[in-house]
Amino acid sequence: MISVTEEPLEVATHERAVAQPGAGAVVSFAGVVRDHDHGRTVTLLEYEAHPSAEAVLKEVAAEIAASDPEVRGIAVSHRVGVLQIGDAALVAAVATAHRTAGFAACARLVDEVKARLPVWKRQVFADGTEEWVNCP
């Protein structure tokens, strides 16, 4: 399960997608919309993605899987569109043979997605102002 979608994201769905008998650990991450940024109250976020975004997710997942023989499965999704406070914007799950590898692989996955995924975020603040983040 690797996607860029407008649909709500669920951690449990990603965990089920990677779970298997040979995996002793399933480690997950949910990046959720918070109500503030740098001391300003946030009311909502809107994400837009480049058409290549899903291909980039697949590339990152493949690299993480290839880099560690303990990785048994990877699921990762990023949401686009308007998100409310508390909504999941990024969900990742990694199944590995052992927990140490699971935590490390999930952290690398999230870090690489955050660094490489071509998405842009519009933050809307309580005072009516807005800003775009990660715009080239």
Would you name each region that the model predicts?
Residues 1-90, 95-136:
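N-terminal, polar/charged subdomain of small-to-medium soluble alpha/beta proteins
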